[in-house]
A protein has these predicted regions:
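Amphipathic alpha-helical coiled-coil segments
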Residues: 41-55, 123, 127-148, 157, ...
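Membrane-embedded beta-strands of outer-membrane beta-barrel proteins
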Residues: 90, 296-298
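Positively charged n-region of N-terminal signal peptides that target proteins for export
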Residues: 1-5
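Bacterial Sec-pathway N-terminal export signals of envelope proteins
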Residues: 21-70, 77, 94-97, 104, ...
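Small/polar (Gly/Ser/Thr/Ala-rich) solvent-exposed segments
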Residues: 42, 64-83, 95-122, 248, ...
């Protein structure tokens, strides 16, 4: 007796220690692991950093130009100590491009880098949505397998009663055959479903690390989405919709176009250059000692003959800016409309699922139990009993499909909101 108690306690302690480690991973854990492990997202992040570095480089001034040479050299003798204006000259030229245009192009380059960064965030959302679809498919298939097993058990009960009725002379052999065919259809569907489950589990290797795959995926849609709570209106989440990476990417494109327009407008201004020159003359010249010469000046590049080209560039930049602004407004309207549509569908699916669970399920189960009992008593024909069984099975299948649709709506809303729900 003492040994049995000790073994029982040891087994309980072992199960208590092992079960948490074998618990299925949560949806959020899987999504975060997939995002952290995605090489494509790392490529986009590195590209955004590279573009920021290039943007910072646009602010740098061009390199100065150093010139060494002889000036005013006599062409007949090529002697630099005979003419008083001959000099060994060192000159330095520093170009100073249009500052406003340079600052605008720097801003445009930064917005281009932000576009790439937002593209990375959008790709992360799309990756999470694709992973959720796989997890929903897997959880639905697993629940479908359990449901097919329960449905086969229901048909097995009816088959047993039909066989008893046939042996008692109260039914035909066709009744037994019909229910066996229906039962075999469930068995065949179970085999196909098992194959689909294995395929769905294998597809997770594309996204998830081995540590999570060992734990196993959530076994049901309820585990995948613990709460199907109501979603707020689009007006309440307007800021979140506006912060969606798809909208922010278009916003960055709009601001980049605006900066390019500012650069095109600033190009009407002049460019500058500063020149310094020092000319050394020969102290040993027969003409006597001569002082060295120093020169300084400013060069202004006037955009006179390229104004038509610059005007066309400015007009094109303004059109691009207006187009990007229109694309942003359209994207925000589309996000709001899609959110309202998905939210309405999710509410309808939740209401329908509640109706199934509170009304249709109990009704179909009671009808089936009573029909089976009356068929066993011989007071109900076989076709009516089979109809009751099939009604129960179709109710169960319809409810499971509805749960799948509700999970898909939840996933779509998560994608649109761009972040996790407060209740999660």
């Amino acid at each position: 007796m003492f040994l049995r108690i000790a073994l029982t306690a040891a087994m309980a302690a072992t199960l208590a220690t092992v079960s948490p480690a074998q618990a299925a991973f949560s949806r959020l854990e899987a999504e975060r692991a997939a995002v952290a492990d995605a090489l494509a997202l790392q490529v986009l992040s590195q590209e955004a950093e590279a573009q920021r570095a290039q943007a910072r480089a646009t602010r740098a001034l061009p390199n100065p130009q150093l010139r060494l040479g002889l000036t005013n050299l006599p062409a007949d003798t090529f002697a630099w100590d005979q003419e008083p204006m001959t000099q060994l000259q060192v000159s330095l030229r520093q170009a100073l491009p249009n500052g406003r245009a340079r600052a605008a192009r720097f801003t445009a380059a930064l917005e281009g880098a932000r576009q790439t960064s937002e593209q990375r965030d959008l790709a992360a959302l799309e990756l999470r949505a694709a992973l959720r679809e796989r997890l929903i498919e897997l959880a639905w298939r697993q629940e479908q397998g359990h449901l097919l097993g329960r449905q086969e058990a229901v048909l097995a009960q009816l088959e047993s009663q039909a066989l008893s009725a046939f042996k008692a002379g109260r039914g035909g052999e066709s009744d037994v055959l019909e229910v066996r065919l229906a039962r075999q259809a469930r068995v065949q569907a179970q085999l196909q479903n098992d194959t689909a489950v294995a395929s769905a589990e294998a597809s997770l290797q594309r996204w998830l690390p081995e540590a999570l795959l060992v734990q196993g995926a959530p076994a049901s849609l309820t585990e995948l989405f613990p709460t199907f709570t109501s979603w707020p209106t689009s007006a309440a989440v307007e800021d979140r919709l506006a912060a969606h990476p798809a909208a922010r990417r278009l916003e960055a494109g709009w601001k980049m176009a605006g900066a390019q327009r500012d650069a095109a407008k600033a190009d009407f201004g002049p460019d500058y250059a500063v020149d310094f020159a020092y000319g050394a003359r020969d102290d040993l010249s027969p003409l006597g000692r001569r002082p060295d010469l120093l020169s300084a000046g400013i060069t202004i590049s006037l955009p006179l003959f390229g104004r038509e080209k610059q005007a066309q560039g400015l007009a094109a930049a303004e059109l691009r800016e207006e187009g990007q602004r229109a694309a942003l407004r359209d994207a925000l309207r589309a996000l709001k409309a899609d959110y309202d549509s998905r939210r309405s569908a999710a509410k309808q699916q939740s209401d329908a699922l509640t109706h199934y669970e509170t009304t249709l399920f109990p009704l179909a189960e009671r009808h089936w139990e009573r029909s089976l009992a009356r068929f066993a008593e011989g007071t109900l024909p076989f076709d009516r009993a089979l109809a009751a069984a099939l009604a129960l099975l179709s109710t169960q299948s319809a409810a499971l499909d509805l749960k799948r649709q509700r999970a898909q709506s939840e996933s779509a809303l998560l994608f649109l909101i761009g972040q996790e729900l407060d209740h999660e």
